[in-house]
From Swiss-Prot:
HAMAP family reported for this sequence: Ferrochelatase
Native organism taxonomy: Bacteria, Bacillati, Cyanobacteriota, Cyanophyceae, Acaryochloridales
Gene: hemH
Protein name, per record: Ferrochelatase
Organism: Thermosynechococcus vestitus (strain NIES-2133 / IAM M-273 / BP-1)
GO cellular component terms given for this protein: cytoplasm
UniProt enzyme class: lyase
PANTHER family: FERROCHELATASE, FERROCHELATASE, MITOCHONDRIAL
Pathway info: Porphyrin-containing compound metabolism; protoheme biosynthesis; protoheme from protoporphyrin-IX: step 1/1
Length: 388
């Protein structure tokens, strides 16, 4: 008899081929959790503009790592390894992969889950730390699918919002860092550089996103498990657009450390569990070049966990614990910890209020975007007036 238990692994997704880059970017920037705008109707046109203008540069970046993202292949390896690990602890389960912005899409995974008549489902994001722009975006999509489909509502599901503090995950990260440190000429002199994917600062300060808090706690846990004397720093990478993101920024800290005389860096991709463009290209190529030009002599990067045995065992334990615990629902997890209005704003607000200030910021962003479009296109009201 086929198993009626399923595990749905959630991830971002990535383009498999150069021709997939533009539609992937369009899907990414169409998500209001990625770029928040005051009016829904602006989302698709802006996504089209950004994906079209960025496609060529992004394709060049992907060309540096073979033309496409390895994320799907690695996630499939993780799913197979997790299925075997679950069988090893007596749990028969079907594994499904749901990517947010590229194939196999979350909707495709849900269709297969229904076809397989799954009755118990663990939803496990492959993001150790929760953010409204990663796990939160996928959870909101799933919640919408559940609300629209009576068949899905028959499934007993549970969410694992984050697992940055799971002992097995922490131990696996410490193990990989230890191995990389020991490859350095002078291991104790290396600075351990944790680089996390950034998010706009407003996600944390306005929307109550726990991401920064969980990242910082995760670093403390890993350093305690590592138990080495090395200095360490935390910075944030992959900033996009004109708004302020979490700081300090990775490239700035690299330059600061080099100016202080640091010669050896061991970079840890703290928010990534699989190799993809932000580890293979952004860290391994861009940041390595910045470090070398600044005088860093040894630049080593800790590999992503991928299908590391300890990591897969930790995922299996997470699933086991989730099946035994009371279920966690979308309504529970998607509720912001702060009482502020999340996207989309339902009405305009005037005055010196936090809501009015958010509108001011959004209008400023729209003005900036309009200026960028005019600068790129060479057409618009400022050109007509002779101001550009």
């Amino acid at each position: 008899m086929a198993s009626q238990t399923g595990v749905l692994l959630l991830n971002l997704g990535g383009p498999d081929r150069p021709e997939d880059v533009r539609p992937f970017l369009y899907n990414l920037f169409s998500d209001p959790e990625i770029i928040r705008l005051p009016f829904r109707w602006l989302q698709k046109p802006l996504a089209w503009f950004i994906s079209t203008s960025r496609a060529r540069r992004s394709q060049a970046n992907y060309a540096q790592i073979g033309g496409g993202s390895p994320l799907r292949r690695i996630t499939e390896q993780q799913a197979r390894a997790l299925k075997d690990a679950l069988e090893g602890i007596g749990i028969e389960a079907n594994l499904y992969i749901g990517m947010r912005y590229w194939h196999p899409f979350t909707e495709e995974a849900i269709a297969q889950i229904k076809a397989d008549q799954i009755r118990e489902l663990v939803i496990l994001p492959l993001y150790p730390q929760f953010s409204i722009s990663t796990s939160g975006s996928s959870f909101r999509l799933l919640e919408s699918l559940w609300n629209q489909d009576p068949e899905l509502q028959k499934i007993r599901y549970t969410l694992i919002p984050s697992w940055y503090n799971h002992p097995g995950y922490v131990a696996a990260m410490a193990d990989l860092i230890r191995q990389e440190l020991d490859r350095c000429p002078n291991p104790d002199e290396a600075v351990i550089f944790f680089s996390a994917h950034g998010v706009p600062k407003s996600y944390v300060t306005e929307a109550g996103d726990p991401y920064q808090e969980e990242i910082e706690a995760c670093v403390r846990l890993i350093m305690a498990a590592l138990n080495r004397p090395n200095a360490h720093v935390l910075a944030y990478q992959s900033r996009v657009g004109p708004v302020e993101w979490l700081q300090p920024y990775t490239e700035d800290v690299i330059l600061e450390l080099a100016a202080q005389g640091v010669k050896t860096l061991v970079v840890v991709p703290i928010s990534f569990v699989s190799e993809h463009i932000e580890t293979l290209q952004e860290i391994d190529i861009e940041y390595r070049e910045i470090a070398a030009e600044a005088g860093i002599e040894v630049f080593r990067r800790v590999p992503a966990l991928n299908d590391h045995n300890g990591f897969i065992s930790a995922l299996a334990q997470l699933v086991k614990e989730a099946l035994a615990a009371p279920p966690r629902t979308f309504a529970e997890v998607n509720q912001s910890r702060k009482r502020v209005k999340l996207y989309p704003q339902e009405r305009w607000e005037w005055g010196m209020t936090s809501a009015a200030e958010r509108w001011n910021g959004r209008l400023a962003m729209l003005g900036f975007l309009a200026l960028m479009i005019e600068l790129i296109s060479g057409q618009g009201p400022l050109h007509m007036l002779g101001l550009l």
